[in-house]
């Protein structure tokens, strides 16, 4: 739940090796630190855009507050995506891009997940209905599960695809079977039986 009247004693620090390349920080970052305290890991400005890393257990509450608070009003979910780095020591990131049309602000939120742990974050479909296909694409390409999503299934690949998740760094660069075999599997998947004609067109 969103705490009432809590304040952070120390502002989140800029992470090492991330340049602060000018631009004023989005005031929402300071507001988040004041409201959510140590559940905000850190924040920084890069190329004029404010980035905020949030603990995974708080991300739904943070996004809900940004959407509903009259001083924030982030009405538009621009994108949900993920990033996996070549450095095995770096966590996999789930990224939400939010925009406030009322206050002309942009905010990038991130959650860090260990590639060796469960890749799961809460769905925000109950806040933004437009998150539906964005979350499904993250599941399809990265294997990130969005807890609470009512229909989490593949959206770009066929449902019976078993080769893994194509945007992960451990995805094989060479297929284990021919393009003809892939086509055969795709045709056998019978997408019309699982998807509406509206989705297919």
Which role does the model predict for each range below?
Residues 1-201:
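Terminal low-complexity/charged segments
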